[in-house]
Amino acid sequence: MLHPIDTTIYRAGTSRGLYFLASDLPAEPSERDAALISIMGSGHPLQIDGMGGGNSLTSKVAIVSASTQRSEFDVDYLFCQVGITERFVDTAPNCGNLMSGVAAFAIERGLVQPHPSDTTCLVRIFNLNSRQASELVIPVYNGRVHYDDIDDMHMQRPSARVGLRFLDTVGSCTGKLLPTGNASDWIDGLKVSIIDSAVPVVFIRQHDVGITGSEAPATLNANTALLDRLERVRLEAGRRMGLGDVSGSVVPKLSLIGPGTETTTFTARYFTPKACHNAHAVTGAICTAGAAYIDGSVVCEILSSRASACSASQRRISIEHPSGVLEVGLVPPENAAQSLVDVAVVERSVALIAHARVYYTTPDRRRSYDSPLTSPSTPADTHNLFDAAYRPVIQPSDTDVEAPHMLALENKEQCVSRCDTALHHIVASYGASDAHASDRSLS
């Protein structure tokens, strides 16, 4: 059975996703997840039967509602990473890129209403994944989102510039900045840093795994030996962080980190977690920025070794990734002696792609030959006859070597006879006096 649901599609940062009102989706989490899996077409590498796009950057969903339980916030936001070949929905991490579209969606759907004279709108967001707060500032004109704020030749359509302030980013998943209690650990012969700020990330130096940091994602994704080793490290890191078996989770993430160029602080290849990101996650960049100022972390060691490293007072880092550069500004805590970051500031852009109606199926209502289709106006036994006519005359066994079409040709006359009989019964059920079928052939 098909169920319609309205959605808005945005390109948000370097991701694309579908945005839904929470009230439009099933309330029970398992039913909600089943609906999202159906909408995105998960289970096929191209998600050809849905909206996912066959890529982790586009198989994303934002679920938004008015924040009725928390008066200090405008909206609640739940991020869902939907599997591609695997049929799953992971709500453990936040997604900063997709969050950049939440303010636009909240305004478009009437959850937030700017004054007609406002030129910017502040939207206060409570993230249900990390249980943390963020603020988004978006340009508006006459009470609507101003998508013409950016007109960049590198963008396919006009976009709105969004400022994101991540508040209290420490311990997004584990409640601790250093989940293992250490700034660095050794796993599988590698020195790593496991940091939880905005999202849990395992940092590994690029040269320790034999890469330069200039490799294309496709090159790294083809390196099965590297991917296998990174997954071993990630699984052990998850155990040490207290997350248990993370083989079925998208956290912790992995970042292969190295020194940047003359104009950037770092180069990074970010894994999501079993494939290299085509760009870089915003939350991962925030974690990188925080890790850069944690004494003893591998990220801090890289920063400290560079003559052009930014000063602690600037608290701004830039990360070169496969698609460009991502900058993060940091607001240090009131107690400067602490190696913590209270607020991280990032700028993204958001482009409106479509307001649309999509459809999802209810799994237990899918038709099969074991449960024939019936309707009030047509006798059920008529459908049973018609279904029987189209079933294979001979069911191939495991030892059959003939192709299915050869079996169909060999039993052509039997199949025609069955269809003819079914047609007789169908017409007769509606009171017709004759239902001869003649000159039929199978092509």
UniProtKB/Swiss-Prot annotation:
Source organism phylogeny: Eukaryota, Fungi, Dikarya, Basidiomycota, Ustilaginomycotina
Gene3D superfamilies: Diaminopimelate Epimerase, Chain A, domain 1
Protein known as: Aconitate-delta-isomerase 1
Similarity annotation: Belongs to the PrpF family.
Species, as recorded: Mycosarcoma maydis (Corn smut fungus)
InterPro entries: PrpF-like (IPR007400)
EC number of the protein: 5.-.-.-
One Gene Ontology cellular component: cytosol
Pfam families with a match to the protein in the record: PrpF (PF04303)
